[in-house]
Amino acid sequence: MKTKTDCSVCAVAIVKEEDRFIEEWLVYHRLLGVSHFFLYDNDPKLPLRSLLGASASFVTVIDWPGDPTAGWPGRNLQIKTYTHALAGKAASYTWVTFLDPDEFIVLRKHDTLPDFLSSFENVGSVRLNWHVFGHNGYYEDPQGLVTAALTRRMAAPSPRTKAISRTEAVSSIDSAHYCRLKRGWRTVDANGRPYAEALYPGKTERAHINHYQCRSFLTWMGRVTRGDVSFDRSTVPADDRWRLDEHLCLRQFVETVARDKNELVDDYMLRFETPILTHLAARSDRGSPDPGRPRWEPANLSSTIHGSPTIPERRRRWLPGVAGRLSDGLIRLHGWRLRRRLQRNRAGE
């Protein structure tokens, strides 16, 4: 099957309450070779355009407020958004990836996405497994870059994936995690093998997705008030009700994030700390439409030696159980406050 010869890549994302993190996500994926970003602004309180500054040349912002299911029975906001993007200018690029702002594509053997994707001839979609990161013991969001601060994750990859798909091969989008392909196109994993959900040794050695789903304990608990782009309260499946209930959200944190998501130190992304901060500093120098935005100073850059980062001493002091022990104390305090509030509410009924 004859395919497009270039390897241009665009990324599509829904953005809500990501003012502290979106620039890092943009710069990092720009360094990987993403040509353009289509950002769907789902935050009416803080317009995304006020945050972007020098990103405007390679970012298209689409205002995207409202009910996630209005007019789309059975479809969530992500599917509606991605379908809209692919029906528009995203289709002019060879490849498209649908990501969340807490998901970072990681290439272990290639410098750029075009280099990586050039080896996938006659392939319609490449599915990359998640590596799920924990909170590293942070109660509040860490200062600086997410990719530098959060270095602890589950030891095993997640079977869940996100896809990079050829725009000409996509038939429809039925999930936020993959695309349905037209007849004749095939889906592979990062190693070029026919895609299968089962894990095997080396499945993420070439490429994967770092999923920073829990930047801190407070950010995790804030999911309840922020809402979820995948569901509303009337349609959320039973297994996902924790996303919309504070008590269940706390329990989910205790049983999954604090226990399982801080098992292994993975500091691969530290090698990008200097390039990311350098680009952020340069973008700050070119000005921003919001004078209140913080500036990134080159003086704060970390040093690197032959591509291997010099890890600050504070990171070396993390021992395997520290994140879990710190979380335990903070969670108990938060749980006590939650129980007291529930008791007061019941007493007032």
Segments and roles (model prediction):
Residues 8-10:
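Cell-envelope/extracellular polymer assembly enzymes that use nucleotide-activated donors
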Residues 35-43, 63-66:
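Short beta-strand/loop segment that forms part of the nucleotide-sugar
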Residues 47-98:
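Active-site-proximal specificity loops/subdomain of glycosyltransferases
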Residues 300-349:
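Boundary detector for helix-to-coil junctions that initiate low-complexity/charged tails
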Residues 42, 100-104, 109:
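Short acidic donor-binding/metal-coordinating loop in glycosyltransferase active sites
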Residues 75-80, 107-310:
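Catalytic-site signature of metal-activated, phosphate-bearing donor transferases
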Residues 13-27, 43:
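Active-site beta-to-alpha loop of glycosyltransferases that engages the nucleotide-sugar donor
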Residues 27-36:
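Short, acidic, metal-binding catalytic loop of nucleotide-sugar glycosyltransferases
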